[in-house]
């Protein structure tokens, strides 16, 4: 956790007002919360509350070092879209836990272990706004702003998503 806080402090000292923690797509923070990858039997495994302990430690350390005015945007996979991976229900449960330690939740999907089903942005074969359904479902359960990412290619589509309250920002 200290190394993440150190990097956040460097960003703050350079004038940045926030950091984006990449807790999705199978990277380390995601590996702790994913049932596909976290098979630990200690205090960091088992329930979602236990699996969320390390991401929480990272967020708390960043706030401790950088202050509450330094924002944390937490990027998470709302679903890993692969067998044995996080489901939307898991994503909602994690978002409900992590929301008290972050300022913004950024919803993507997939994992680098499964490139076919990773939806950081849409291809020409996917619907545009391919993660909006995940972001909208998570938004219903949290009190912090939610970002949806995934191929928003038209201003009208963005306006519609925002007006419908499905997300607070798009990326």
Predicted regions and their residues:
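Flavin-dependent oxidoreductase catalytic cores
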Residues: 1-171
């Amino acid at each position: 956790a200290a190394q993440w806080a150190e990097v956040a402090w460097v960003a703050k000292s350079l004038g940045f007002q926030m950091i984006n923690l990449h807790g999705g797509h199978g990277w380390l923070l995601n590996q702790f919360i994913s049932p596909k990858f976290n098979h630990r039997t200690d205090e960091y495994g088992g329930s979602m509350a236990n699996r969320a302990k390390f991401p929480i430690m990272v967020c708390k350390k960043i706030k401790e070092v950088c202050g509450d005015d330094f924002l944390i945007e937490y990027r998470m996979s709302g679903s890993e879209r692969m067998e044995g991976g996080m489901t939307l229900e898991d994503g909602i449960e994690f978002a409900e836990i992590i929301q008290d330690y972050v300022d913004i939740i950024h919803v993507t999907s997939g994992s680098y272990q499964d490139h076919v089903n990773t939806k950081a942005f849409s291809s020409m074969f996917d619907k545009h706004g391919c993660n909006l359904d995940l972001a909208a479902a998570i938004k219903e359960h949290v009190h912090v702003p939610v970002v949806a990412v995934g191929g928003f290619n038209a201003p009208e589509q963005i306006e519609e998503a925002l007006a419908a309250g499905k997300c607070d920002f798009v990326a």
